[in-house]
Amino acid sequence: GSYKPNSLFIKRAKENENLKDVIFCNISFGDANSMVKELENLKIDTQNLIFSQVVSSYTNTSIKAVQEYQTLMKKYFPNAELGFLSFEAFLSSKILVNAISRITGDITREKLLLTLKTTPNNLLDGIPLEYKNSQLLNKTYLFEYKNRQFIELTNEK
């Protein structure tokens, strides 16, 4: 994935005296979990890293969809690490399976797209869905990596 070149860029930048304290922001497709692990393996400081995600924290068990994700991962993949990428894939799979199950008759591209556009807002138990701009997840979450965990950055004081 793109985390390796991103990690290499951050490594080289942090080795430069003029850039070592710069704040870096990685976009969600860059796999935050793998990037942090790569930087830690390279013995690079993981301070001043911000990650954007289209999903909430995979550790926030106050959200029912997170509880379900964690339960199923432990059951079927007990040795796998939890992460943003697998959580996003889990949510996407739930949406897709729901859409396919609501199609009557033959499954066609047109029917699938129409059904995806009418996904119930509450399907993901605590994660709001609304179809607009050709997507269902419309919130962006920002996290910083601190004390070996991802902490959500919020506007709240």
What is each PLM-predicted segment?
Residues 1-7:
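A conserved active-site cap/scaffold subdomain adjacent to cofactor or substrate pockets
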Residues 5, 31, 92:
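Short phosphate-engaging motifs
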Residues 10-87, 150-152:
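Extracellular/periplasmic periplasmic-binding protein-like sensory domains
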Residues 73-87, 94-149:
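Segments of small-molecule ligand-sensing domains
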Residues 155-156:
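Residue-level structural signal for beta-strand termini and adjacent loop
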